[in-house]
Regions:
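Generic secondary-structure boundary/loop-capping signal
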Residues: 39, 71, 82, 117-118, ...
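C-terminal region of N-terminal signal peptides and the immediate post-cleavage residues
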Residues: 4, 24-47
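Extracytosolic low-complexity repeat regions of secreted or lipid-anchored proteins
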Residues: 95-175
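Hydrophobic membrane-insertion alpha-helices, especially the h-region
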Residues: 12-30
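N-terminal leader/targeting helix
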Residues: 37-69
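Terminal targeting segments of Actinobacterial cell-envelope proteins
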Residues: 1-8
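Extracytoplasmic/periplasmic/luminal assembly and interaction segments
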Residues: 56-106
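A generic structural signal for short, non-catalytic loop/turn and secondary-structure boundary residues
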Residues: 35, 89-91, 135
Length: 175
């Protein structure tokens, strides 16, 4: 082959390698790119202490990620004292509410679970659960979808332990 017959074999191989590499990069970007997270809709519930200093401090410090969940915007109007996270693979969000009233089911003798020095009371609703802190100056609720695993409650327990002092629990008298 002479120079007048076209590009050399080396140039053709280099061009082919570059083209395959460019296609590989485009495919890798397409596979790893996540669609934008949908905003989280949070119903308004009474939260008389949502503007109290402990809630403001907590909400200012919540992380952008809770395990596989990423902080998401909240549909307007945003209820006071709330934050939400979504996972690309999950349809249900993780929702945090701060400044709520004491849960009505939290009575003397209710089972409590401790996660990283924070005491939680669980309320089950269909296939999800809501956990309430019961040993802090304000009640914080964390609603977890099925399959969310322990990471969200562990990370938030650590944060709550650092941002809010512990107080004695105060369940409603039984009966």
């Amino acid at each position: 082959m002479t120079d007048s017959e076209g590009p050399s074999r080396t140039v053709l191989i280099a061009a082919l390698v570059l083209a395959v590499g460019a296609i590989g990069v485009v495919l890798a970007i397409a596979v790893t790119r996540h669609p934008p997270l949908q905003p989280v809709a949070i119903a308004t519930v009474p939260a008389p202490h949502a503007q109290d200093p402990p809630c403001r401090t907590l909400l200012a410090a919540v992380p952008q990620r809770l395990g596989d969940y990423q902080r998401a915007s909240i549909v307007q109007p945003v209820p006071a004292g709330t934050a939400g996270w979504r996972a690309a693979s999950a349809s249900e969000p993780v929702v945090l509410r701060c400044g709520l009233d004491r849960p009505t089911d939290f009575v003397v003798g209710s089972p409590i679970q401790v996660v990283d020095q924070v005491q939680w009371f669980e309320v089950r609703q269909d296939d999800r659960s809501t956990w309430y802190t019961v040993d802090r100056p304000v009640y914080v609720a964390l609603t977890l979808p099925p399959g969310s695993g322990p990471t969200p409650i562990q990370q938030l327990s650590e944060l709550i332990g650092h941002t809010m002092p512990a107080v004695p629990i105060s369940p409603t008298p039984a009966g």
